[in-house]
Amino acid sequence: MRLESVAKFHSPKSPMMSDSPRATASDSLSGTDVMAAMGMAQSQAGFGMAAFCGKHELSQNDKQKAINYLMQFAHKVSGKYPGVAKLEGNTKAKVLQVLATFAYADYCRSAATPGARCRDCHGTGRAVDIAKTEQWGRVVEKVCGRCKGVGYSKVPASAAYRAITMLIPNLTQPTWSRTVKPLYDALVVQCHKEESIADNILNAVTR
């Protein structure tokens, strides 16, 4: 069972869950099986499970839990980022909260997010390669140049920067780009890593 099935489980079309064809109905996962598997996955990959469930609007509580996990991670690695490491006390905590909140919002973004779908590829991640299409006389596609193949626009890092300047008024754009934004980017990546970990664990416990 993969993580995608967790979202389906919360509004199932049938009482049995399965990602692939099974030999018999008894080979499918019952609701009890799924809940038990989710519990095991949450105990081993709480961050990833909370991140995924929050992203799919399964629980507002999971959203906040995911941001809290992300803040803990940010605090742990903040020493690597000069623009954050030098901050003290309450200011640092607030900056980490802002970074975690914006990073989680970026992780949650998809082509289904209102207003986020790429205008060029309409969410497919693919666009017509005009030059090659004319050269070969048939439609040739390429990775969409606007969205880089993801099908949607990311949360602008500039929005996080503006929010941070409310806490650090003298933070310039160049300093942000060099010393703070790398942490923001790392937080987005960490969300995807934690989801992957949770997905692997859930798959392992349901084999």
Swiss-Prot record:
Zn(2+) binds at residues 118, 121, 144, 147. GO terms for biological process: DNA-templated transcription termination; transcription antitermination. Signal peptide: none annotated. A zinc finger (unnamed) spans 118-147. The record marks 101, 160, 165 as: Interaction with host rpoB. One of its GO terms (molecular function) is zinc ion binding. Residues 171-192 bind DNA. InterPro entries: Antitermination_sf, Antitermntn, HSP_DnaJ_Cys-rich_dom_sf. Residues 1-28 are annotated as: Disordered. Gene3D superfamilies: 1.10.274.110. Coiled coil: none annotated. Pfam families: Antiterm. Keywords: DNA-binding, Host-virus interaction, Metal-binding, Transcription, Transcription regulation, Transcription termination, Zinc, Zinc-finger. It comes from the Viruses. The record marks 134 as: Interaction with host RNA polymerase sigma factor RPOD. Mediates the switch from middle to viral late gene expression by associating with host RNA polymerase (RNAP) so that the latter can read without pausing and through transcription terminators preceding late genes. Competes with host factor sigma 70 for binding to RPOB, the beta-subunit of host RNAP. To join the elongation complex, binds a specific DNA Q-binding element (QBE) and interacts with RNAP that is paused during early elongation. Participates in the lysis-lysogeny decision by activating the expression of the late lytic genes. Interacts with host RPOB (via flap domain); this interaction renders host RNAP resistant to transcription pausing and allows it to read through termination signals. Interacts with host RNA polymerase sigma factor RPOD (via domain-4). Interacts with host NUSA (via N-terminus and AR2 domain); this interaction releases the autoinhibition of NUSA. Belongs to the phage antitermination Q type 2 family. This is Antitermination protein Q.
